């Protein structure tokens, strides 16, 4: 299936794989696109009614086969009785709703309702399955008409048309054998031999029914149907369903692979020994503008460590939007991707930035053991991690080495027309990618762990660090409380000391002022006028001035 999807790249037009996704930048970190396809979803189904009559009409040989028929009926009862009980249990609490119009003339069927009070507890799937089963069941009149038709027919495969319904295909697997072999041989064979032959044929038919419709017998409500059972239901002509629903051969194959065709048992008759199956064939609706892209990654080396970029296997683009794509309910064909339900779901903004070319938004993880691709062929060029595997030019016999500052090597015909890598010889084309990608020119994303053991270990380490951080925070809270109490006491001491210093300062200033005042009084000289000073040696001018 991977090879089939890879070949899709050749048949799809080039413009489908360009646009929102920056393949150039992604290729620098080892991510390349390997294909793109349109997107189809299975929608409302068309139904076919199939009646499998397990007990043939044996009127002509009834006298010789009573013992074998009784044993065969007992065998059928062990299979059909549990199915009938299960169907009754599912549908007993579902009743039809009549319109609220009081007039009998205008009273008509309006739908079905679930008797929730009687049912008690039921899941959404059980409720939906029960209502769908009730809606596909025939009414009593249709069942009686069908039973009458089956009792009167001696044909192995007969189409029965009922009023207002599509064609019903009735299958009686042993009837041809009875009509064409046993009845003509009644005059030549003894009753014992006829009974033995019929018994063996019935046992073989019983085994065949169990093999073909075993899933429906085990799961009467929503079992998938095999291609063998589908061919059996169509009388061996598989082209009928292709013509009726407009399927192509690849569409039908994809629908079968994705288990899109369902068959549910809607009625079991343990008296006439027949079962009624409703086979649902889904219609296909292409979602315009949605393209599904397949991705592959190549590991790259940073020093001695080998890494690869973690991206999903598939993504979807529609306009500017990039979405995740779940391939579980899908099948891939050359014409497109067919899914039994909507497989698109939102992508994180960070991963969208990665696909749009921001390599720093692309997470990476270490390669575990030998897991991971180490080379891939894209656009005719070989993208290889030649630091982890041996790359050799087959033409010249020389080794292609990868420098430590390169994370990947891109090999084209201008470097080496024929390359031998990891024991595989590949002829490459003209260059579509640069010669090499250097580590210092790439912004790599954050490293993450994907292995369960690594994730568990990292979570354990994170929890341990958080516990240690909590202990440190508690210790710091205690220290802060201590400092807060000590700071209040210290503040009081400081205020008292400042007050004492201020009082002492005031006293000192007061004492100094008084002392200075006393000194100025003592130093004042009062001259006595009765004494004459000694003026010997004094100049006359000074004396005259005196």
From Swiss-Prot:
Extracellular side: 20-491
One Pfam family in the UniProt entry: Fusion_gly
Cystine connections: 330-339, 354-362, 386-391, 393-416
Parts of the chain that traverse the membrane: 492-512
Keyword Transmembrane helix part of the UniProt annotation: yes
Residue stretches in coiled coil: 134-162, 458-483
Quaternary structure, from the entry: Homotrimer of disulfide-linked F1-F2.
Protein name: Fusion glycoprotein F0
Organism whose genome encodes this protein: Rinderpest virus (strain Kabete O)
């Amino acid at each position: 299936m991977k090879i089939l999807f890879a070949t899709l790249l050749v048949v799809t037009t080039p413009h489908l794989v360009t646009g929102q996704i920056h393949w150039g930048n992604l290729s620098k970190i080892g991510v390349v696109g390997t294909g793109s396809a349109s997107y189809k979803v299975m929608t409302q189904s068309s139904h076919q009614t199939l009646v499998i009559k397990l007990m043939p009409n044996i009127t002509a040989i009834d006298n010789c086969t009573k013992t074998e028929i009784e044993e065969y009926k007992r065998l059928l009862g062990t299979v059909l009785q549990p199915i009938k009980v299960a169907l009754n249990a599912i549908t007993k609490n579902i009743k039809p709703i009549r319109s609220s119009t009081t007039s009998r003339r205008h009273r008509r069927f309006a739908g079905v309702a679930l008797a929730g009070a009687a049912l008690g507890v039921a899941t959404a799937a059980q409720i939906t399955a029960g209502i769908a089963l009730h809606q596909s069941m025939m009414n009593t009149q249709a069942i009686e008409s069908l039973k009458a038709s089956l009792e009167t027919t001696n044909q192995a495969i007969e189409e029965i048309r009922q009023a207002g319904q599509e064609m019903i295909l009735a299958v009686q697997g042993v009837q041809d054998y009875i009509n064409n072999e046993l009845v003509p041989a009644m005059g030549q064979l003894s009753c014992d031999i006829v009974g033995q032959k019929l018994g063996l044929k019935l046992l073989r038919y019983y085994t065949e029914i169990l093999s073909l419709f075993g899933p429906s017998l085990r799961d009467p409500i929503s079992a998938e149907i095999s291609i063998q059972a589908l061919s059996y239901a169509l009388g061996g002509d598989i082209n009928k369903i292709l013509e009726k629903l407009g399927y192509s051969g690849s569409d039908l194959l994809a629908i079968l692979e994705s288990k899109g065709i369902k068959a549910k048992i809607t009625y079991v008759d343990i008296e006439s020994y027949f079962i009624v199956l409703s086979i649902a064939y889904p219609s296909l609706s292409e979602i315009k503008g949605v393209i599904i892209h397949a991705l592959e990654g190549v590991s790259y080396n940073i020093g001695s460590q080998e890494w690869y970029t973690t991206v999903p296997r598939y993504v979807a683009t529609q306009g500017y939007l990039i979405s995740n794509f779940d391939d579980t309910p899908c099948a891939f064909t050359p014409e497109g991707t067919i899914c039994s339900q909507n497989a698109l779901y939102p992508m994180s903004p960070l991963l969208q930035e990665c696909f749009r070319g921001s390599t720093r938004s692309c997470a990476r993880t270490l390669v575990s053991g030998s897991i991971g691709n180490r080379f891939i062929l894209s656009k005719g060029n070989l993208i290889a991690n030649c630091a982890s595997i041996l790359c050799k030019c087959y033409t010249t016999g020389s080794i292609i080495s990868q420098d430590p500052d390169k994370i990947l090597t891109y090999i084209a015909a201008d470097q080496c027309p024929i390359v031998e890598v990891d024991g595989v010889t590949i002829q490459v084309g003209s260059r579509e990618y640069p010669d090499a990608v250097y580590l210092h020119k790439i912004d790599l994303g954050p490293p993450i762990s994907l292995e369960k053991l690594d994730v568990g270990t990292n979570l354990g380490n994170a929890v341990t660090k958080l516990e240690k951080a909590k202990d440190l925070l508690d210790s710091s809270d205690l220290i802060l409380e201590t400092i807060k109490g000590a700071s209040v006491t210290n503040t009081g001491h400081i205020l008292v000391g400042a007050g004492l210093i201020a009082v002492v300062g005031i006293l000192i200033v007061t004492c100094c002022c008084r002392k200075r005042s006393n000194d100025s009084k003592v130093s004042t000289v009062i001259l006595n006028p009765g004494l004459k000073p000694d003026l010997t040696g004094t100049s006359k001018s000074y004396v005259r001035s005196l």
